[in-house]
Swiss-Prot record:
It comes from the Bacteria. It holds the Pfam family UVR. SMART domains: DEXDc, HELICc. It comes from Neisseria meningitidis serogroup B (strain ATCC BAA-335 / MC58). Keywords: ATP-binding, Cytoplasm, DNA damage, DNA excision, DNA repair, Excision nuclease, Nucleotide-binding, SOS response. One of its GO terms (biological process) is SOS response. Forms a heterotetramer with UvrA during the search for lesions. Interacts with UvrC in an incision complex. This is UvrABC system protein B.
Length: 675
């Protein structure tokens, strides 16, 4: 492993091997585009060509902070794990939604049903979010891996920075002033329960457990009114780690606000409330008039007394001082001016970013219309797409199949078609639809004999289920991947396929970007000639690419005619194959099969979340004694949580509460080391 630091770059790249294939030219091309000031570029990188490694090299050589956007938590976790391996000495951060479970506030007029906001916050993810913003403000060697959570409103960066507590050995400051500052930063005093986001006082010593810290706490030792020494210590064992000359404690929430800002916001909220009460009075809607007055006055009382209230984000416009309709502050406002943005799998992510605002707006409108929220609540929202475009730094779109937006905006397209391993795109074979099930059966048997795996994609859920049942009856080990399966279970199914616990995976939308299964040597696309979203040329290229990580990779398209989408996908795949084969011949490269260790792609990130990804009916409860280890506990929690969410959706709140308590028992007794 070679460690490389380029001139004027704060990044130390741990390079397992030098760039190969198309990587060197792609890296040089992207760096040239950045230095030429191109606002948008596209990295057209085929499956398995090492796009993440190329991104890491561009970041290391440019020396600029970076944000990498992904379209789901699984892909973000995969990128985060890889970037941490490339940059273990730099600040690689993870910024995704910190909700394990989130039921937004909503009102259903037809049933006169108001649904209170309910959520379960994952403390580990919250700590990582706070760590991300802290490092953006204090370091220049930062890489943030984020989902669309980055375009949702968080606290204003200017006010967030005003609320820090900076301490230095030798400073003169009274103990009560330190305590008052910590309380205003929403730290809790916890002399008995010392946890993240709390502090405790013992004589002249104040221990602070910073909200963004995953393992170390700060000890402030005072002598009279002077800071005598500062030490970092292990909050679990109490052992000292190192003495520090100075330290900056950041707020325990992104929504912390100075007292004068809170008071100013309260006056502004009162004014809006008065206008809203008058509006409902004119409209002769006494129920809504009473509702908005009662709810808002309660929130105002909490703000005056505590400085925050439940649902404080709905008043964010009053706190930030922005005008109606102006974009809220987001993570994008924390980025330094010289940052670079990578949008991974941009053909999906760009569309996803564009769709976030409208879904949020329609729900908020009902709350406003029926007096549950003031109209300013509509400004607590994700960015609209044109607002996102305005705050985008220099951007590199990364995709094997760039969409129309990238094609229209990219100043240049850099191709990364040749893989470092010498693997070429799979050979495409077209066969008739009439015999597709039986023909595929014989192909599957061939692959099973060789110890290889098969992906089968169908058009409908019914077809997928019938095919799975049919092959299963014939003795083939087959599983069906469908939309009801949550993120963690999906990762487990893919891991089981790689381990050979079953040989065939059937699904409807198996083009899932980032699906990395080197053992798959055959991708079968049934009814490939039916035009539509699942059989568009981009979907076909993505699906065919799932076999590109295997030296014997083949894609069989079952079709009676060649559609425009099929032709485009076949032509593009053949173009890439020709280029790859030619390069291999010129360089004397023999394609090498990828041998990739089977492990959880989300090591270090998702195990914290495993305990909150799915739920099981109360009647299926398992006694604590039947759970023997942490792995059993995690699986049991996953089942219980799936059932809890379903019970909540079915309005079976008593059952949901029982399941919630059961989950808490397992976590306390097993996951956190009961005696």
């Amino acid at each position: 492993m070679e460690v490389i630091q380029y001139p004027n770059s704060p990044f130390k790249l741990h390079q397992p091997f030098p760039p190969a294939g198309d990587q060197p030219t792609a890296i040089a091309g992207l760096l040239e585009g950045l230095s030429d000031g191109l606002a948008y570029q596209t990295l057209l990188g085929v499956t398995g060509s090492g796009k993440t490694y190329t991104m890491a090299n561009v970041i290391a050589q440019s020396g600029r902070p970076a944000i990498i956007m992904a379209h789901n938590k699984t892909l973000a976790a995969q990128l985060y794990a890889e970037m941490r391996e490339f940059f273990p000495e730099n600040a690689v951060e993870y910024f995704v939604s910190y909700y394990d479970y989130y039921q937004p506030e909503a009102y259903v007029p037809s049933r006169d049903l108001f649904i209170e906001k309910d959520s379960a916050i994952n403390e580990h993810i919250e700590q990582m979010r706070l760590s991300a913003t802290k490092n953006l403000m204090t370091r220049n060697d930062v890489i943030i891996v984020a989902t669309v959570s980055a375009i949702y409103g968080i606290g204003d960066p200017t006010e967030y920075q005003q609320m820090v507590l900076s301490v230095k050995e030798g400073d003169t400051i009274e103990q009560r002033d330190i305590i008052a500052t910590l309380v205003s930063m929403q730290y809790e005093r916890g002399d008995l329960d010392f946890k993240r986001g709390s502090f405790r006082v013992r004589g002249d010593v104040i221990d602070v457990y910073p909200a963004e810290s995953s393992e170390n706490a700060l000890r402030i030792s005072l002598f009279d009114d002077e800071i005598d020494r500062l030490d970092m210590f292990d909050p679990l064992s109490g052992s000292l780690i190192q003495r520090v000359g100075r330290y900056t404690v950041f707020p325990s929430s992104h929504y912390v606000t100075p007292r004068d800002t809170v008071l100013r916001a309260c006056e502004s909220i009162k004014e809006e409330l008065r206008e809203r009460i008058e509006f409902f009075a004119r409209e002769q809607r006494p129920v809504e008039q009473q509702r908005i007055e009662q709810r808002t006055r309660f929130d105002l009382e909490m703000l005056y007394e505590m400085g925050f209230c439940k649902g404080i984000e709905n008043y964010s416009r009053h706190f930030s001082g922005k005008k109606e309709g102006e974009p809220p502050p987001t993570l994008m406002d924390y980025l330094p001016d010289n940052a670079i943005m990578f949008i991974d799998e941009s053909h999906v992510t760009v569309t996803q970013i564009g769709g976030m605002y409208k879904g949020d707006a329609s729900r908020k409108q009902n709350l406003v219309d029926y007096g549950f929220r003031l109209p300013s609540a509509r400004d607590n929202r994700p960015l609209k797409f044109h607002e996102f475009e305005k705050v985008m730094p220099q951007t590199i779109f990364v995709s094997a199949t760039p969409a129309k937006y990238e094609e229209e905006h990219a100043g240049q397209v850099v191709e990364q078609v040749v893989r470092p391993t010498g693997l070429v795109d799979p050979q495409i074979i077209i066969r008739p639809v009439a015999t597709q099930v039986d023909d595929l059966m014989s192909e599957i048997n061939d692959r099973i004999e060789k110890g290889e795996r098969v992906l089968v994609t169908t058009l409908t859920k019914r077809m997928a289920e019938q095919l799975t049942d049919y092959y299963s009856e014939l003795g083939i080990k087959v599983r069906y991947l469908h939309s009801d399966i949550d993120t963690v279970e999906r990762v487990e199914i893919i891991r089981d396929l790689r381990l050979g616990l079953f040989d065939v995976l059937v699904g409807i939308n198996l083009l899932r970007e980032g699906l990395d299964i080197p053992e798959v040597s055959l991708v079968a696309i049934l009814d490939a000639d039916k035009e539509g979203f699942l059989r568009s040329h981009r979907s076909l290229i993505q699906t065919i690419g799932r076999a590109a990580r295997n030296v014997n990779g083949v894609a069989i398209l079952y079709a009676d005619k060649i559609t425009d989408s099929m032709k485009a996908a076949i032509d593009e795949t053949e173009r890439r194959r020709e280029k790859q084969i030619k390069f291999n011949e010129e360089q004397g490269i023999v394609p090498q099969q990828i041998k990739k260790q089977v492990k959880d792609i989300i090591d270090g990130v998702y195990h914290e979340e495993d305990g909150s990804k799915g739920r099981l009916k109360g009647k299926n409860k398992v006694k604590v004694g039947e759970i023997h280890n942490e792995e059993d506990a995690i699986k049991e929690i996953a089942k219980l949580e799936k059932a809890m969410q379903q019970a909540a959706r079915d309005l079976q709140f008593e059952e949901a509460a029982v399941l919630r308590d059961r989950i808490r028992d397992i976590k306390e007794n097993l996951l956190f080391g009961a005696e």
